[in-house]
Amino acid sequence: MEQGRPRSSLSLTSSASTVSSLSSLSAKKPTRVVHKVHAFGKRNNALRRDPNLPVHIRGWLHKQDSSGLRLWKRRWFVLSGHCLFYYKDSREESVLGSVLLPSYSVRPDGPGAPRGRRFTFTAEHPGMRTYVLAADTLEDLRGWLRALGKASRAEGEDCGLPRSPARPRPGEGPGGPGGPPEVNRREEGRTSESPEVAPLSRGPGRHEMHAPGSSADLQPDTWSRRTRSPEPFSPLSRPPSPLSLPRPRSAPVRRPPLSAGDISFPARPHTPLSRIDVRPPLDWGPQRQTLSRPPIPRRGPFSEAGGGRPPRSPQLRTPEHRTQSTQVSSGSSTYLQLPPRPPGTQASMILLPGPPVDSTLHQSLETDTLLTKLCGQDRLLRQLQEDLDKRQEEKEQLEAALELTRQQLGQATREAAASGKAWGRQRLLQDRLVNVRAALCHLTQERERVWDTYSGLEQDLGTLRETLEYLLHLGSPQDRASAQQQLWMVEDTLAGLGGPQKQPPHTEPKSPSPAPQREESSERESLSESLELSSPQSPEVDWGQPPGGDRALSSSQSGVGSPRVSRASSPECRQQSSPLLRTKAPLARPRMSAQEQLERMRRNQACGLSLPRPTSPRLLTLGRTLSPVPRQPDMEQRPIVGAAKWLRSSGSWSSPRHSTTYSPVSGGHRERVLSLSQALATEASQWHRLMTASPERNLDTRGDCLQPSPQPPSEELPQVTSSPTSHKANSATTGFSCQGSGRGLAPWEPRWDPGKAPPALAQEEGAWPLRVTLLQSSF
């Protein structure tokens, strides 16, 4: 049992050659004790650097020589993983030496240290060589101390639980391709140990003779398995949880569950208590044992925790081993780990949540940051606008000076000297004009960029104000108070800014002009015009409103109106309406109702006919009363030619009481329109026959006389007058006389002689094509 066990093993916490170990073949040779500090890790004994490990810091440092006059030598140092390598120069070709930093104490030198250089620090280990290094600046010193301190405490993401690795490949060290060199050379039998280890490593202790003896009967192959595998390098302290450790690159993904013999951790009583033996992992550093972190809390027996590891045999863990695994050396400054806490205290300490995040403070800081950025962008916009104004004024002055110079050149062609001066002045002005225009272009692009940032900040501020208003109404009392303060701060800042900035004119989204609408099809124009004039709103209310936003607002509130008089047509609302709404506005037009189609048919029929002037003064008065007031200029109304500008509705003007939105009907809508148009044509032909017939047929006992419709005055045609032929018909011998008040049906008597026929209408006058009886019923 004792022959299969090596006398000494490789201790990674100090270095690969601090305590050299013999292979199983050289175990019979006596170990020679060297009573001096061994200079380790230089040249051939240096560790091989793994190129896959990350480099934490690299740079130039001055290293004090360990022999002779203690001269300072400038070397290139690289901290990779937990090992410090140094080279001759920054090409990093050949390693001059290596220092494995775990269990080293790295501290800066005091001001009174007789080093001869500034910014020095020391890395020392008991029984090992002490390294004295010096940085060039104070910042370099702080950076190196921070990095080397973490590496000496074995902190970082590349340290973890050493797992049972696969067998090392031939030609590789026990730690894999990047591990320490294999130390089974026979010519290295004269390797030495440190003074502390040598007196204790001459033979096994008493506890070592008896402690594993009880388990030797139960597990006879334990020591042979330990000899073949690198298990003697496993740590003596409690290992952390395997779930928190990264998987090595060369290790298999899945491993079989370990037996009790594989998990046993042998004790080494000949090792000082201040050192822990760790086996070299596969990647020589990524999974190194974390020495400064507290161990995983115990949750009771393994059967309760449900872990994947089987319970250890009680014979494998003696009280001596427990004391060795929990004791901490007072001489080493690296191992400042406290003894394990009780399970309840440790679990409660780990499960304690962090301090709650103050959402109110975070939101206040966000508001303050947003307002600060907004003020900065506002200042930039104002400065850019001032610069643009100055450059624009300078450009105008240069253009005026160039015009004057051009005139002088035209006048002074005879004088050579004056002409030369004028040409030089013109050249200078042209150069300055080019520079000013280039500056204008640059300032314009800069203003566009700042404006984009300003617009984004305005949107963020609007969202933040909505959130604050929501908290002000529905939040907790504390949130309400904070939201109110932030809202006041926002209002004060915006008031100090003097309102929002105006968008640059050349980047303003242009609203659709009415010119393309005029060039559309005649059907679309007729629809818009009929919607304008046959709107459900009464003309008195519509024409009595002031121009601008109030009219547009009332039109949008009514729900129905023409797209030309919508809210988006006013200049104020054109800037506020989004491009999406402006593109969809022309598409959302309602279908024409039956009444609107009749209006359109009548208007088209009356366009080419000049209507005669009614002879009754009563009808003239009513026509003037019903004539529409000229519309406001902001309505973008298309000019109407001829008699088509005056449209008579069927019966009366629409009233707000009957303002119902038209919903398109299905089924016989088209047939209904055709039947109505046919009835109108029949009535028109009957009216034509009545006007051209004899007086006997014209005088009917029904008294159901038809009243001609008035022709109101308009802008282009102040009063539609009849032709000379109709003027003769309106004389004293011919015409109409009305009796009654105009309410209801009243007999209309002719004023011509009974023996004579009524005057026939001229061809250019035409007949009355409209249903004028409905106009009488509306009075």
Swiss-Prot record:
Using the chain's own numbering, where are the disulfide bonds?
A: none
Q: Where is the composition biased (Polar residues)?
A: 567-580, 720-740
- Domain PH: from-to ranges: 54-153
A Gene Ontology cellular component where this protein is annotated is: cytoplasm
Which Gene Ontology terms describe the biological processes this protein takes part in? Answer: positive regulation of canonical Wnt signaling pathway; positive regulation of Wnt signaling pathway, planar cell polarity pathway
Alphabetically ordered keywords of this record? Cytoplasm, Lipid-binding, Membrane, Phosphoprotein
Cross-referenced InterPro entries, in alphabetical order?
A: PH-like_dom_sf (IPR011993), PH_domain (IPR001849), PKHA4-7_PH (IPR040392)
Question: Which residue intervals are annotated with compositional bias (Low complexity) in the record?
Answer: 246-259, 324-334, 528-540, 608-627, 649-659
SUPFAM superfamilies found in the cross-reference section: PH domain-like
Domain of life according to the entry: Eukaryota
- Which GO MF term does the entry hold, naming one? phosphatidylinositol-3,4-bisphosphate binding
Q: Where is the composition biased (Basic and acidic residues)?
A: 183-193, 517-527
User: Has UniProt tagged this entry with the keyword Hydrolase?
Assistant: no
Where it sits in the cell: the answer is: Cytoplasm; Membrane
- Name the Gene3D superfamilies on file: Pleckstrin-homology domain (PH domain)/Phosphotyrosine-binding domain (PTB) (2.30.29.30)
- Describe the function of this protein: Binds specifically to phosphatidylinositol 3-phosphate (PtdIns3P), but not to other phosphoinositides.
Its protein name is Pleckstrin homology domain-containing family A member 4
